[in-house]
Structure formats: C-alpha cells, structure tokens
From Swiss-Prot:
Domain Link: start-end pairs: 149-243, 246-339
Residues covered by the Ig-like V-type domain: 35-143
Tissues of expression: Brain. Predominantly expressed by neurons. Colocalizes with versican V2 in developing and adult cerebellar white matter and at the nodes of Ranvier.
InterPro entries xrefs: C-type_lectin-like/link_sf (IPR016186), CTDL_fold (IPR016187), Hyaluronan_bind_Proteoglycan (IPR050691), Ig-like_dom (IPR007110), Ig-like_dom_sf (IPR036179), Ig-like_fold (IPR013783), Ig_sub (IPR003599), Ig_sub2 (IPR003598)
Single Gene Ontology BP annotation: establishment of blood-nerve barrier
Compartments (UniProt record): Secreted, Extracellular space, Extracellular matrix
Cysteine disulfide links: 58-129, 171-241, 195-216, 266-337, 291-312
Function of the protein: Mediates a firm binding of versican V2 to hyaluronic acid. May play a pivotal role in the formation of the hyaluronan-associated matrix in the central nervous system (CNS) which facilitates neuronal conduction and general structural stabilization. Binds to hyaluronic acid.
Protein name: Hyaluronan and proteoglycan link protein 2
GO MF annotations in UniProt: hyaluronic acid binding
UniProt entry tagged with the keyword 4Fe-4S: no
Length: 341
C-alpha cells in the first residue's frame, strides 16, 4: 500500500511554505539569515537648495566578495527608475541623467555615497542605492528635498488657460518647475491660500485652502482640494510652480517706465528684467521687501512684502502682491532686475 503522511505531520510540512508564500504575496520578502551589507541611513530625507552640493549617504557595513552598487532616481508619477551611476567599488560609470554633476564620495573603501553638485530644481525626488551581489540584492531609498517656495501662476489671458504641458513650460519660463504635491502641501502649511486650481508635476489638479469659504470649495475644513484625474492635453487650469534659492540678486529700479524702458534700464545695469520665480525666490530667501510695483519679464507688475504695513498691499500677511498685466506702454512702474553674481 502507498505510504500516507499523517495529517499533523503534513500540516507541519505545509505551514512554513504557506507562510513564506503569503509573506511574499503581501510584498514583503520573507526573513532570511543572510548578511545585510548596506547600513540603514540615519536620515532618509536630505535637505538642500538650488546651486548647493548634496550628499546622499550609502555605506556598506562590510564588503561582499563581488558586488556592484547601482544609483537610480525614481521618477514621480511614473513606474520607472532612471539609472544614474554604477560602481564595482573600484571604477564608476555614470549614465548621463545628472551629467558630470554626479560622482561618488569615496570617503573610505565602503563608502558608495552619491554627491550631486550644483543642485537643480529637477534633482528633487526619491533616489535608490542598490547593492547587487548576485545572491541577495538589497537597497536603501533616500529623498532629496529642496528648500523653496511655491507660487501660483496664470498668463495675461486670465485664469485656466494651461493644459498640463503648457503649465509645465510656463513654470520653466519663470525660473521654476511644476510643484509636486508634497511641495504644495508644505506651502499650505506655511500659509499658502489660493482659490484657483492648478496643475502639479504628477499631473493632478489641486488648490490649497486655509480659510474655507463658499466660493472656494464650500465651508468645509481647510486642506488641499483635488479635482481628481484630469486630461493632460484637453483640460485647462492654472499652474503651481516651485523655485528655490538664486545664484544672483534681484534689485529694484524706481521710475515711471514702460515695459520696454524697464528692459533697457536693467540692461544698463548689467542685468535683465526679473522673472516671476526670481522675485519669489528673492522674497523667500533674501527677505526682499519693496512697497513699489515693478515690471517683470512676463509683462506683469508685482512687488514683494515681508513686513505687512498700511498702504502697502492692504493684506495682513507677507507675500508677493500683483497688479496683474498692465498695458506694456503704461509708464507707471519701476522694474525688478536680476543680475548673476
């Protein structure tokens, strides 16, 4: 007769396999006794500014006999990673995403930390350091977060003129990029209250509300309102842009100038008419406070206030005030210039 496995023995045999399969089905690798070579980072979020040098830590506790370390960036809103650099501990090869700005720190033989020089706005995001040794691959994830400022933007034609791609280009033309949801949320916690919906980098459309009111989503609770999934080509909204610290300086030139005269005034001083992102960055990082409207490169007239006071914008909070888009021939304003250092 064929031999039979007693039920208790069969269950004892089956349970470990079932537990392992269930554990993997949940997306968590089953525990294994093998060594862990990568040390967990002390800080998973690294803060930096545009133009600075950032170091993303990735350190081995011990070195396997043969291995490679692969650095990549996890693209927001996309299920893919972009390769940055691969090293075998002796030699490294970069793959062009960060150009010549990315290198290994090599503080010691177990140091695979990534250095990014001259940090740019598009460098913000999530990065992965992966150890590949042919047996048990492992990785650590880190987030590079830039200090900056979010500003709403609409063109001279009025609100809700941009599809996603036009909003993206508009932010870049104003020395910024489309803000992420995380950046908009941070700006909301710092006081951003805006009743017009705008595109974000991930392709969503949202707006931040601090004071709930009927014309602005109703009398519900404060928060980030969402319009849900939108068609990137067809649907039209404003843009929420993000910018960071400047390499140069913004300064005000007084007068009663037309827009063309404003450009000439800045050129005479070795500068250009400032962009909207330049003015917001100077307000945020340099404390620029000027109670005079000035032309900007997009044809708008704005002024930055860090200390609210009577007859200076009429609002109780700091911010960048706007006079909209006057006629370019209207000789009523000074100008804000931007000069590289």
């Amino acid at each position: 007769m064929p031999s039979r496995i007693p039920l208790p023995a069969f269950c004892c045999f089956l349970l470990p396999w079932a537990f392992t399969s269930f554990h993997k089905a949940l997306g968590n690798p089953a525990p294994h006794p093998g060594p862990h070579y990568l040390l967990p980072p002390i800080h998973e979020v690294i803060h930096s500014r545009r133009g600075a040098t950032a170091t993303l830590p990735c350190v081995l506790g011990t070195s396997p006999p043969s291995y490679k370390v692969r650095w990549s960036k996890v693209e927001p809103g996309e299920l893919r990673e972009t390769l940055i650099l691969i090293t075998n501990g002796l030699h490294a090869r970069d793959y062009g995403l960060l150009g010549g700005r990315a290198s290994l720190r090599r503080g010691h033989r177990l140091d695979a930390s990534l250095i990014i020089k001259n940090v740019r706005l598009e460098d913000e995001g999530r990065y992965r350091c992966e150890l590949i040794n042919g047996i048990e691959d492992e990785s650590v994830a880190l987030t590079l977060r830039l200090e900056g400022v979010v500003f709403p933007y609409q063109p001279s034609r009025g609100r809700y003129q941009f599809n996603y791609f036009e909003a993206k280009r508009a932010c870049e033309e104003q020395d910024g990029r489309l803000a992420t949801y995380g950046q908009l949320y941070q700006a909301w916690t710092e006081g951003l209250d805006w009743c017009n919906a705008g595109w974000l980098l991930e392709g969503s459309v949202r707006y931040p509300v601090l004071t709930a009111r009927a014309p602005c989503g109703g009398h519900g609770r404060p928060g980030i309102r969402s319009y849900g999934p939108r068609d990137r080509s067809r649907d039209r909204y404003d843009a929420f842009c993000f910018t960071s610290a400047l390499a140069g300086q913004v300064f005000f030139v007084p007068g009663r100038l037309t827009l063309s005269e404003a450009h000439a005034a800045c050129r005479r001083r070795g500068a250009v008419v400032a962009k909207v992102g330049h003015l917001y960055a100077a307000w945020k990082f340099s404390g620029l406070d000027q109670c005079d409207g000035g032309w900007l490169a997009d044809g708008s007239v704005r002024f930055p206030i860090t200390t609210p006071r009577p007859r200076c914008g009429g609002l109780p909070d700091p911010g960048v005030r706007s006079f909209g888009f006057p006629r370019p021939q209207q000789a009523s304003y000074g100008t804000y210039c931007y000069a590289e250092k």
